[in-house]
Amino acid sequence: MRDSTVVIRHHHGGKKNKGNRERKKEEKRRRKYLQAVSKIKKKARSNVKDWGLYGYCRMTEFGVEGGNLLEIDGSGMSFAEFSHGIEKRHVPCVIHNLLRHWPAMKRWASVERLMEQLKGVTCKVGSDDDGYAVRMLFEHFVAYMDDPEHGKKDDSPLYIFDSTLLDKTTLKHDYLVPYLFSEDLLKYAGEERRPPHQWMCIGGPRSGTSIHVDPLGTSAWNALVCGHKRWALFPPGSVPEEVLKPKGVNSAARWFDVVWPQTLEDSWKYEKPLYVEQGPGDVIFVPSGWWHVVINVDFTVAVTENFCSSANFHRVFMHTRISRPKMTQKWLDRLKTVRPDLARIGQQIMDNDERCSDISSPSSSSSSSDDDDDDDDSSVSS
C-alpha cells in the first residue's frame, strides 16, 4: 500500500512538473514574441510614437460598401477583347471568375492553411529608415494580428507585403497569372535586372497601402483569395498630388479618415473617385498612372503583380530609360529579336532623347560613368 501510495504521489508530481515546464516554455515564447514585435515596430516606423493615437480600432467603416467601378466577367472575355476594350483605354475594373481554378483559393483561405506553408518563414512587414526590409516570423505576425495590445489596437497595423515569399516557398505553385495579364514584356529585360514585380499581401483590418501610383509606368492586377478590400482610384492628373497626399497622411486608414470624406462633399472640386469593395475571387485591374489606395476590411490574403504589356509599353519604356538605363538597353536589344514592332518604338524614344540632348547640350561629353549604373535591386512598392 505504501509503495502504491508513493507511486501515485510521484505520478501526480510528474504531471505538475510537466505543467510547469510547459508554462515556462509558453512564457518564454511570449517574451520572445513581445520583444520581436517591439523591435520590429520601432524599425518599421521609427517616427510613430503612439500606434493607436487616432483610435481607428473603434471605427467599423472605412470607405463605403458597393462601388461604381466597372465590373466584367473574366470567364467570357478573350485576351484581345480585354487588351483593346479595357487595357488600351486605361479603364480600371473589377474582374470576376478568373480564379476559380487556383489551388490558392483553398490553400490560402485561412491562417491555419497558410501556417502549414509559412511557419518559420520571415516575411517583410516594412522598411527601416535606410530602406532595408524589416522582417517578422509568420507565426509572430499571426500572433500580432490577434493581439489586443498590438494588431487589434494599432491604427494602421503591420502588413505583409513581400516580393520574395512566392519564390522562396511553395506558394508560387498555388496560382497562375490570369490569362488576361499574360503578356509580360519586362521578362525580356532579364530576371536578374528587372525590378520586383510580384508580391504576397497578408494583413488584418485597417492595414493596407496608402495612396500611390505604381512604379515605372506599370499597370497592376490584384487577386484576392480571402477577405475584403476597399479601393479608391483617381485618373492620372485629375487631382493635385498635394490634395491626394496631404502632409501627415501616410497610411490607408488615415487616408480614408481624412481625405475620403472630402471627396464626398459637394465642395470637392475635383474628379470624384472610382471605388469598389473587392471580395474573395475578385481581381482588380489598375491601369498605368492611376492613383489608388487600398484598405483591408478584415483578414485578407492576396497576390499582386505589376506588369508591362503592349498597351502601356510606351509609358513604361519612357520611365525605365531614365531610372534604369542599362536594364533598358538590354531590354531593347532583346525586344529586337522577340518583338521587333515594340523595339522600333523603343528605339525611336531613345533616338529622340539623343537628339534632344544634342540640341540642349551641344558641347557636353557623350561618355557616361559607371556611377550611373542602375544595378540597384531595391524593392519597389505597389
What are these regions (language model features)?
Residues 1-283, 295-382:
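N-terminal accessory scaffold of Fe(II)-dependent oxygenases
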Residues 290-292:
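Short, charged beta-turn/beta-strand-edge "cap" motif at the junction between a beta-strand
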